[in-house]
Amino acid sequence: MDVRQSIHGAHAKTLDTQGLRNEFLVEKVFVADEYTMVYSHIDRIIVGGIMPITKTVSVGGEVGKQLGVSYFLERRELGVINIGGAGTITVDGQCYEIGHRDALYVGKGAKEVVFASIDTATPAKFYYNCAPAHTTYPTKKVTPDEVSPVTLGDNLTSNRRTINKYFVPDVLETCQLSMGLTELAPGNLWNTMPCHTHERRMEVYFYFNMDDDACVFHMMGQPQETRHIVMHNEQAVISPSWSIHSGVGTKAYTFIWGMVGENQVFNDMDHVAVKDLR
Protein backbone atom coordinates (compact mmCIF):
# COMPACT_ATOMS: atom_id res chain seq x y z
CA MET A 1 0.00 0.00 0.00
CA ASP A 2 1.36 3.38 -1.08
CA VAL A 3 0.24 6.01 1.46
CA ARG A 4 -0.06 9.68 0.45
CA GLN A 5 -0.41 12.40 3.07
CA SER A 6 -2.78 15.35 2.89
CA ILE A 7 -1.13 18.52 1.62
CA HIS A 8 -1.90 22.22 2.01
CA GLY A 9 -2.28 24.35 -1.10
CA ALA A 10 0.39 26.75 0.18
CA HIS A 11 2.85 23.86 0.40
CA ALA A 12 1.89 22.38 -2.97
CA LYS A 13 2.71 25.60 -4.84
CA THR A 14 6.33 25.41 -3.65
CA LEU A 15 6.97 21.95 -5.15
CA ASP A 16 9.00 21.28 -8.27
CA THR A 17 7.98 18.84 -11.01
CA GLN A 18 9.11 15.71 -9.17
CA GLY A 19 7.64 16.96 -5.91
CA LEU A 20 4.21 17.38 -7.51
CA ARG A 21 4.44 13.94 -9.09
CA ASN A 22 5.42 12.35 -5.78
CA GLU A 23 2.42 13.86 -4.00
CA PHE A 24 -0.35 13.53 -6.59
CA LEU A 25 0.53 11.16 -9.47
CA VAL A 26 -0.30 7.44 -9.42
CA GLU A 27 2.16 6.32 -12.05
CA LYS A 28 1.48 2.57 -12.21
CA VAL A 29 -2.13 1.47 -11.90
CA PHE A 30 -2.07 -2.00 -13.50
CA VAL A 31 0.39 -4.81 -12.74
CA ALA A 32 -0.14 -8.34 -14.09
CA ASP A 33 -1.74 -10.74 -11.59
CA GLU A 34 -1.62 -8.21 -8.76
CA TYR A 35 -3.59 -5.37 -7.24
CA THR A 36 -2.15 -1.89 -6.78
CA MET A 37 -3.32 0.30 -3.93
CA VAL A 38 -2.76 3.98 -3.14
CA TYR A 39 -4.23 5.26 0.13
CA SER A 40 -4.73 9.02 0.28
CA HIS A 41 -5.32 10.79 3.58
CA ILE A 42 -7.43 13.26 1.58
CA ASP A 43 -10.91 11.98 2.52
CA ARG A 44 -9.23 8.53 2.94
CA ILE A 45 -9.92 7.39 -0.59
CA ILE A 46 -8.13 4.30 -1.92
CA VAL A 47 -7.46 3.98 -5.66
CA GLY A 48 -5.82 1.30 -7.75
CA GLY A 49 -6.09 -1.33 -10.43
CA ILE A 50 -6.46 -5.10 -10.65
CA MET A 51 -5.36 -7.03 -13.75
CA PRO A 52 -5.75 -10.80 -13.34
CA ILE A 53 -4.16 -12.82 -16.16
CA THR A 54 -2.94 -16.26 -15.11
CA LYS A 55 -4.71 -16.37 -11.74
CA THR A 56 -7.47 -14.76 -9.73
CA VAL A 57 -6.67 -11.74 -7.58
CA SER A 58 -8.24 -10.64 -4.32
CA VAL A 59 -7.43 -8.18 -1.55
CA GLY A 60 -6.77 -10.23 1.57
CA GLY A 61 -6.29 -9.65 5.25
CA GLU A 62 -2.84 -8.20 4.59
CA VAL A 63 -4.40 -4.72 4.47
CA GLY A 64 -6.25 -5.22 7.75
CA LYS A 65 -3.55 -3.84 10.00
CA GLN A 66 -3.07 -0.71 7.90
CA LEU A 67 -6.82 -0.06 7.76
CA GLY A 68 -7.54 -1.17 11.34
CA VAL A 69 -10.05 -3.83 10.26
CA SER A 70 -10.25 -7.61 9.82
CA TYR A 71 -10.95 -7.47 6.05
CA PHE A 72 -10.80 -4.89 3.26
CA LEU A 73 -14.46 -3.85 3.01
CA GLU A 74 -15.38 -4.17 6.68
CA ARG A 75 -15.91 -0.40 6.86
CA ARG A 76 -15.63 0.57 3.19
CA GLU A 77 -17.53 0.58 -0.12
CA LEU A 78 -15.97 -0.21 -3.49
CA GLY A 79 -16.58 0.99 -7.04
CA VAL A 80 -15.03 -0.83 -10.01
CA ILE A 81 -15.06 -0.01 -13.75
CA ASN A 82 -13.54 -2.48 -16.23
CA ILE A 83 -11.58 -0.85 -19.06
CA GLY A 84 -10.16 -4.12 -20.41
CA GLY A 85 -11.49 -7.44 -21.67
CA ALA A 86 -14.36 -9.34 -20.10
CA GLY A 87 -13.89 -10.55 -16.55
CA THR A 88 -15.71 -11.67 -13.44
CA ILE A 89 -15.98 -10.32 -9.91
CA THR A 90 -17.18 -12.79 -7.29
CA VAL A 91 -18.57 -11.17 -4.14
CA ASP A 92 -19.09 -13.58 -1.25
CA GLY A 93 -19.84 -16.40 -3.69
CA GLN A 94 -22.04 -14.39 -6.08
CA CYS A 95 -20.39 -14.13 -9.51
CA TYR A 96 -20.90 -11.05 -11.71
CA GLU A 97 -19.68 -11.02 -15.32
CA ILE A 98 -18.18 -7.58 -15.92
CA GLY A 99 -17.60 -6.75 -19.58
CA HIS A 100 -15.71 -3.87 -21.16
CA ARG A 101 -16.92 -0.62 -19.54
CA ASP A 102 -19.27 -2.47 -17.20
CA ALA A 103 -19.05 -1.48 -13.54
CA LEU A 104 -19.75 -3.04 -10.16
CA TYR A 105 -20.58 -1.36 -6.88
CA VAL A 106 -19.78 -3.49 -3.83
CA GLY A 107 -21.37 -2.48 -0.55
CA LYS A 108 -19.78 -2.29 2.89
CA GLY A 109 -19.30 -5.63 4.62
CA ALA A 110 -18.46 -7.86 1.65
CA LYS A 111 -15.83 -10.24 3.01
CA GLU A 112 -14.48 -11.90 -0.12
CA VAL A 113 -14.11 -10.14 -3.49
CA VAL A 114 -12.30 -12.15 -6.18
CA PHE A 115 -11.30 -10.76 -9.59
CA ALA A 116 -10.68 -12.88 -12.71
CA SER A 117 -10.29 -12.50 -16.48
CA ILE A 118 -12.31 -14.63 -18.90
CA ASP A 119 -9.65 -14.64 -21.65
CA THR A 120 -5.99 -14.33 -20.68
CA ALA A 121 -5.21 -12.95 -24.15
CA THR A 122 -7.41 -9.91 -23.43
CA PRO A 123 -7.33 -9.56 -19.65
CA ALA A 124 -9.77 -7.49 -17.67
CA LYS A 125 -8.46 -4.23 -16.25
CA PHE A 126 -10.46 -3.38 -13.16
CA TYR A 127 -9.93 0.23 -12.05
CA TYR A 128 -11.32 0.88 -8.59
CA ASN A 129 -12.04 3.58 -6.02
CA CYS A 130 -12.80 2.71 -2.40
CA ALA A 131 -14.14 4.98 0.34
CA PRO A 132 -15.17 4.79 4.00
CA ALA A 133 -18.82 3.77 4.42
CA HIS A 134 -21.28 4.09 7.31
CA THR A 135 -23.92 1.61 6.14
CA THR A 136 -24.43 -1.17 3.61
CA TYR A 137 -26.02 -0.66 0.21
CA PRO A 138 -26.64 -3.62 -2.14
CA THR A 139 -23.95 -4.78 -4.52
CA LYS A 140 -25.04 -3.88 -8.05
CA LYS A 141 -23.73 -4.19 -11.60
CA VAL A 142 -24.06 -1.12 -13.84
CA THR A 143 -23.75 -1.35 -17.63
CA PRO A 144 -23.15 1.50 -20.11
CA ASP A 145 -26.84 1.30 -21.07
CA GLU A 146 -27.85 2.23 -17.52
CA VAL A 147 -25.69 5.30 -16.98
CA SER A 148 -26.82 8.90 -17.28
CA PRO A 149 -24.92 10.31 -20.30
CA VAL A 150 -24.60 14.08 -20.67
CA THR A 151 -22.82 15.70 -23.64
CA LEU A 152 -21.15 19.04 -22.95
CA GLY A 153 -18.82 21.44 -24.72
CA ASP A 154 -18.29 22.32 -28.35
CA ASN A 155 -15.90 21.44 -31.17
CA LEU A 156 -15.07 25.15 -31.51
CA THR A 157 -13.64 25.20 -27.98
CA SER A 158 -12.14 21.72 -28.35
CA ASN A 159 -14.00 20.41 -25.29
CA ARG A 160 -16.91 18.36 -26.64
CA ARG A 161 -17.24 15.36 -24.35
CA THR A 162 -19.77 12.86 -23.04
CA ILE A 163 -20.00 12.32 -19.29
CA ASN A 164 -21.29 8.87 -18.28
CA LYS A 165 -22.42 8.84 -14.64
CA TYR A 166 -22.09 5.28 -13.28
CA PHE A 167 -22.33 5.70 -9.52
CA VAL A 168 -24.55 8.69 -8.81
CA PRO A 169 -27.81 8.89 -6.83
CA ASP A 170 -29.95 8.67 -10.00
CA VAL A 171 -28.41 5.27 -10.82
CA LEU A 172 -27.75 3.68 -7.42
CA GLU A 173 -27.29 4.52 -3.76
CA THR A 174 -23.85 4.70 -2.20
CA CYS A 175 -22.63 6.15 1.07
CA GLN A 176 -20.39 8.81 -0.48
CA LEU A 177 -18.61 7.41 -3.53
CA SER A 178 -19.43 8.83 -6.97
CA MET A 179 -17.79 7.58 -10.17
CA GLY A 180 -18.16 8.09 -13.89
CA LEU A 181 -16.42 7.99 -17.25
CA THR A 182 -15.87 10.95 -19.55
CA GLU A 183 -14.96 10.45 -23.21
CA LEU A 184 -13.76 13.24 -25.46
CA ALA A 185 -15.10 13.41 -29.00
CA PRO A 186 -12.50 12.89 -31.77
CA GLY A 187 -10.41 16.01 -32.34
CA ASN A 188 -11.26 17.47 -28.93
CA LEU A 189 -8.53 17.99 -26.35
CA TRP A 190 -9.80 19.80 -23.25
CA ASN A 191 -11.69 18.40 -20.28
CA THR A 192 -13.35 20.50 -17.58
CA MET A 193 -12.50 23.89 -19.05
CA PRO A 194 -13.79 26.33 -17.88
CA CYS A 195 -12.64 24.63 -14.69
CA HIS A 196 -13.84 24.48 -11.10
CA THR A 197 -13.00 23.38 -7.60
CA HIS A 198 -15.37 21.84 -5.06
CA GLU A 199 -14.53 22.50 -1.42
CA ARG A 200 -16.89 19.75 -0.30
CA ARG A 201 -15.34 16.89 -2.30
CA MET A 202 -11.97 15.62 -3.46
CA GLU A 203 -11.53 13.85 -6.78
CA VAL A 204 -9.27 11.40 -8.57
CA TYR A 205 -8.85 11.30 -12.36
CA PHE A 206 -7.67 8.17 -14.19
CA TYR A 207 -6.60 8.82 -17.80
CA PHE A 208 -6.66 6.06 -20.43
CA ASN A 209 -7.36 5.32 -24.12
CA MET A 210 -4.15 7.18 -24.97
CA ASP A 211 -1.54 6.23 -27.57
CA ASP A 212 2.07 5.71 -26.48
CA ASP A 213 3.11 8.96 -28.17
CA ALA A 214 0.31 10.99 -26.53
CA CYS A 215 0.04 12.72 -23.19
CA VAL A 216 -2.30 14.91 -21.17
CA PHE A 217 -1.19 18.05 -19.37
CA HIS A 218 -3.29 17.76 -16.21
CA MET A 219 -3.91 21.19 -14.70
CA MET A 220 -3.99 21.43 -10.92
CA GLY A 221 -3.41 23.86 -8.06
CA GLN A 222 -5.32 26.78 -6.64
CA PRO A 223 -6.92 28.87 -9.41
CA GLN A 224 -4.39 31.68 -8.90
CA GLU A 225 -1.43 29.26 -8.53
CA THR A 226 -1.89 26.70 -11.30
CA ARG A 227 0.57 23.92 -12.00
CA HIS A 228 0.55 20.91 -14.33
CA ILE A 229 1.46 17.23 -14.25
CA VAL A 230 2.19 15.38 -17.49
CA MET A 231 0.06 12.22 -17.62
CA HIS A 232 0.50 9.15 -19.80
CA ASN A 233 -1.80 6.23 -20.56
CA GLU A 234 -3.41 4.48 -17.58
CA GLN A 235 -2.18 6.84 -14.90
CA ALA A 236 -4.19 8.50 -12.13
CA VAL A 237 -3.89 11.81 -10.31
CA ILE A 238 -5.20 12.93 -6.92
CA SER A 239 -7.01 16.27 -6.74
CA PRO A 240 -7.55 17.91 -3.31
CA SER A 241 -10.69 19.96 -2.80
CA TRP A 242 -8.75 23.23 -3.13
CA SER A 243 -7.36 22.31 -6.56
CA ILE A 244 -8.69 22.75 -10.04
CA HIS A 245 -8.69 19.56 -12.10
CA SER A 246 -8.63 19.98 -15.84
CA GLY A 247 -6.53 18.72 -18.69
CA VAL A 248 -5.51 19.16 -22.30
CA GLY A 249 -4.22 16.30 -24.40
CA THR A 250 -2.13 15.97 -27.51
CA LYS A 251 -4.97 13.74 -28.77
CA ALA A 252 -8.46 12.84 -27.57
CA TYR A 253 -8.60 10.55 -24.52
CA THR A 254 -10.95 9.11 -21.91
CA PHE A 255 -10.86 9.40 -18.14
CA ILE A 256 -12.64 8.00 -15.11
CA TRP A 257 -13.46 10.39 -12.30
CA GLY A 258 -14.18 9.43 -8.72
CA MET A 259 -15.30 11.72 -5.90
CA VAL A 260 -15.79 11.38 -2.14
CA GLY A 261 -16.67 13.96 0.48
CA GLU A 262 -19.57 15.84 2.02
CA ASN A 263 -22.22 15.27 -0.64
CA GLN A 264 -23.03 13.65 -3.98
CA VAL A 265 -24.51 16.68 -5.74
CA PHE A 266 -22.76 16.53 -9.10
CA ASN A 267 -23.31 20.22 -9.91
CA ASP A 268 -22.07 21.46 -6.52
CA MET A 269 -19.01 23.20 -7.94
CA ASP A 270 -17.15 26.45 -7.37
CA HIS A 271 -16.70 27.65 -10.94
CA VAL A 272 -13.60 29.55 -12.04
CA ALA A 273 -13.72 31.87 -15.06
CA VAL A 274 -10.92 31.39 -17.57
CA LYS A 275 -9.99 35.08 -17.25
CA ASP A 276 -9.36 34.59 -13.52
CA LEU A 277 -6.85 31.76 -13.89
CA ARG A 278 -3.19 32.43 -13.21
Curated annotation (Swiss-Prot):
Ribosomal protein as UniProt keyword: no
Molecular function in Gene Ontology: 4-deoxy-L-threo-5-hexosulose-uronate ketol-isomerase activity; zinc ion binding
Keyword field contains RNA-binding: no
Residue sites binding Zn(2+) per the record: H196, H198, E203, H245
Family annotation (InterPro entries): KduI (IPR007045), KduI/IolB_isomerase (IPR021120), KduI_N (IPR027449), RmlC-like_jellyroll (IPR014710), RmlC_Cupin_sf (IPR011051)
Enzyme class: isomerase
Coiled-coil parts of chain: none
Swiss-Prot/TrEMBL cofactor(s): Zn(2+)
The reaction(s) this protein catalyses: 5-dehydro-4-deoxy-D-glucuronate = 3-deoxy-D-glycero-2,5-hexodiulosonate
The enzyme's E.C. designation: 5.3.1.17
Domain of life: Bacteria
Cofactor note: Binds 1 zinc ion per subunit.
Keyword annotations from UniProtKB, A to Z: Isomerase, Metal-binding, Zinc
UniProt pathway: Glycan metabolism; pectin degradation; 2-dehydro-3-deoxy-D-gluconate from pectin: step 4/5
GO biological process: D-galacturonate catabolic process; D-glucuronate catabolic process; pectin catabolic process
Similarity comment: Belongs to the KduI family.
Function: Catalyzes the isomerization of 5-dehydro-4-deoxy-D-glucuronate to 3-deoxy-D-glycero-2,5-hexodiulosonate.
HAMAP family registered for this protein in UniProt: KduI
Name of the protein in its database record: 4-deoxy-L-threo-5-hexosulose-uronate ketol-isomerase
Protein source organism: Shigella flexneri serotype 5b (strain 8401)
Gene behind this protein: kduI
